[in-house]
Amino acid sequence: MTVVSVEHALAGKIPEGGEVTVRGWVRTLRGSAGLAFINVTDGSCFAPIQVVATDTLPNFDEIKRLTSGCSLIAKGVLVKSQGKGQSFEIQASGVEIVGWVEDPLTYPIQPKPMSPEFLREVAHLRPRTNLFGAVTRIRNCLAQAVHRFFHQNGFNWISTPIITTSDAEGAGQMFRVSSLDMVNLPRTAQGEVDFSRDFFGKETFLTVSGQLNVEAYCLALSKVYTFGPTFRAENSHTTRHLAEFWMIEPEIAFADLAEDARLAEQFLKYLFRAVLDERGDDLAFLAERVDKNAISKLEAFINAPFEQIDYTEAVKLLQNSGKKFDFPVEWGLDLQTEHERWLTEEHIGRPVVVTNYPEHIKAFYMRLNDDGKTVAAMDVLAPGIGEIIGGSQREERLDVLDARMAQFGLDKEHYSWYRDFRRYGSVPHAGFGLGFERLVVYVCGLSNIRDAIPYPRAPGSAEF
């Protein structure tokens, strides 16, 4: 007897009339005279499959006591279903109950609406819900598509370190990594913590970005990317921030900002097409329950050419919009989400790439433009969310990089390895960063980024 996934059984990939076995969990159960209709899910797709058990089964009394969350193995014949909205069902020849729910009344995942706030408290159980099952499958689809896109386009995947001594963003909001005894810290003669006696012999941190490290491989392999966890010790209690999240960071050699922007557009459209093609059932559920535009916004995004405008032009448009914003609009200030959304939703009506930002609001490694006031940076803005990608052409001139590092108060000796890239065969290169959870939020229409990752880490919250 063939063990099949629910997805394959419902998709008609198994011959009708064949004997099959499915393994999964009870979503719902209803009964009538001598019959039990069990909706079983195994997580392979959104829809459950109906298992029909009759009172001829020796354990039918047990079967009738099944509740949501119980696990089972059902064997039987796959037949076309007469029920509405179902393609196939299983006429059971046997139902083995593997695991009971200890107390159905106190089981946290009940067949009723549950708020995201409550489900964050039981994050270890929330993938059993319709919502988080859908989000998880879409997250997986996006991750697979990320690797597929880069592989098909000749990129090498680079595993950059999680433990580092460098602050790639220059913001100083990093988590320290130490094996020192916090109760009895070793001290120098000056009374400072003696990190030479720490595990690595120096002060180390969790990475805020893999970009600096991946640049090394870009300048040898031409097209590379990193996709891994990053950490920010920002004390931000917002719906848009996490302390631990995943970043996608491609880097391309012999490239300028225009090529970087083209790559970003191709990349996003590829990802959205993959989700539309592969996870239509989950998107349909999200469109019904979470975001009515879950499908239409992705289709519109794919079909719209990106608009590109200069930061200075964007500021003028915002200042002349006649709209009252909560945050000021002035040249030299970063654009806020409300500004980004006005540009994409009310003024232009499609994705926008804003380029050439003031040099003092962007990172030290971004290439200084000829005007001496702006850098070759870009933000990709999407309707409904604002910034979704941030990138730049990197500063390939050693003297300019050194001046920028001095401006930011960075010790160039500490970054000597990074400066080596400019000393030995330097070339123009560019790249961008895409926060993976922000991407999941956008695709799924979620209102809180803590629902876009299995176990959210945020200020005051590190459960599970």
UniProtKB/Swiss-Prot annotation:
Single GO MF annotation: nucleic acid binding
Pfam families: tRNA-synt_2 (PF00152), tRNA_anti-codon (PF01336)
GO terms under biological process: asparaginyl-tRNA aminoacylation
Catalytic activity, as annotated: tRNA(Asn) + L-asparagine + ATP = L-asparaginyl-tRNA(Asn) + AMP + diphosphate + H(+)
Keywords: Aminoacyl-tRNA synthetase, ATP-binding, Cytoplasm, Ligase, Nucleotide-binding, Protein biosynthesis
Cross-referenced InterPro entries: Aa-tRNA-synt_II, aa-tRNA-synth_II, aa-tRNA-synth_II/BPL/LPL, Asn-tRNA-ligase, Asp/Asn-tRNA-synth_IIb, NA-bd_OB-fold, NA-bd_OB_tRNA
EC id: 6.1.1.22
Signal peptide: none
Cellular compartment(s): Cytoplasm
Origin superkingdom: Bacteria
Subunit structure: Homodimer.
Alphabetized NCBIfam families for the sequence: asnS, PRK03932.1
Official protein name in the record: Asparagine--tRNA ligase
Species the sequence originates in: Xanthomonas campestris pv. campestris (strain ATCC 33913 / DSM 3586 / NCPPB 528 / LMG 568 / P 25)
Recorded name of the encoding gene: asnS
